[in-house]
Amino acid sequence: MRKKLVAGNWKMHGSLAENAALLAALKPALQGIEAAVCVPFPYLAQVQTALAGSSLAWGAQNVSEHGKGAFTGEVSASMLLDFGCKYVIVGHSERRSLYGESDALVAAKYMAAQAAGLTPILCVGESLAERESGVTEQVVARQLDAVVAAAGIASLARAVVAYEPVWAIGTGKTASPEQAQAVHAFIRGKLADLDAAVAAGLIIQYGGSVKAANAAELMAQPDIDGGLIGGASLLADEFVAICRAAAK
């Protein structure tokens, strides 16, 4: 039986005061529930201190493909490990679209994260134009293939995949539970052709305007194993409700 994992992606939000209040609300409410928050780099030390000894894990939203060196402004996987990170998001649609990250670069970041002992949350998903053109499966397959070709199918036993239809991120539009399940089933089936055991054990999160009101219906789908939560992860009551829906 696969466990479910809900991870909050704070994106470029937060302040020391806001974070302290949010974490203070989340920590007791989520005791014993597997969940995580992926926070901006400057707040990793704060989160490490605040969440020490709790069941909440934490991580980052991006990582360099390089181990160390003259790469001004970059942050390496080993640095994230120093701050107690368990997870790091790679290939988020905002990184792919706004910063031009290619499938090859995402694969390199994924491998750098794993080499340091982090669990990458690999994001895949299609745009509205791609969905309307009927190429959702081809797009998702291409994004997965880049990682499998570079790191091998066995590497996915130490990773999480998040399916995020780009057209549903921050738009208020949500893929219907059936639409989401269809893509999750495609992902698992595609990977099962390469390694059935890895595919069966893989956590595949859904990301895209998940909120308390729709979480239970999404989490009830057989191949949806939690969520990668954006805006709702900044609201304690919403995030707790989503985590509890996944834990049922």
Curated annotation (Swiss-Prot):
In this chain, substrate is annotated as bound at N9, W10, K11, G170, S209, G230, G231
**Residues at the active site:** H92 (electrophile), E164 (proton acceptor)
**InterPro entries membership:** Aldolase_TIM, TIM_sf, TrioseP_Isoase_bac/euk, Triosephosphate_isomerase, Triosephosphate_isomerase_AS
Q: Do you know which SUPFAM superfamilies this protein is assigned to?
A: Triosephosphate isomerase (TIM) (SSF51351)
Q: In which pathway does it act?
A: Carbohydrate biosynthesis; gluconeogenesis; Carbohydrate degradation; glycolysis; D-glyceraldehyde 3-phosphate from glycerone phosphate: step 1/1
Q: Which GO terms describe its biological process?
A: gluconeogenesis; glyceraldehyde-3-phosphate biosynthetic process; glycerol catabolic process; glycolytic process
Its annotated compartments are: Cytoplasm
Give the family from UniProt: Belongs to the triosephosphate isomerase family.
Q: What is this protein called?
A: Triosephosphate isomerase
Lineage summary = Bacteria, Pseudomonadati, Pseudomonadota, Betaproteobacteria, Nitrosomonadales
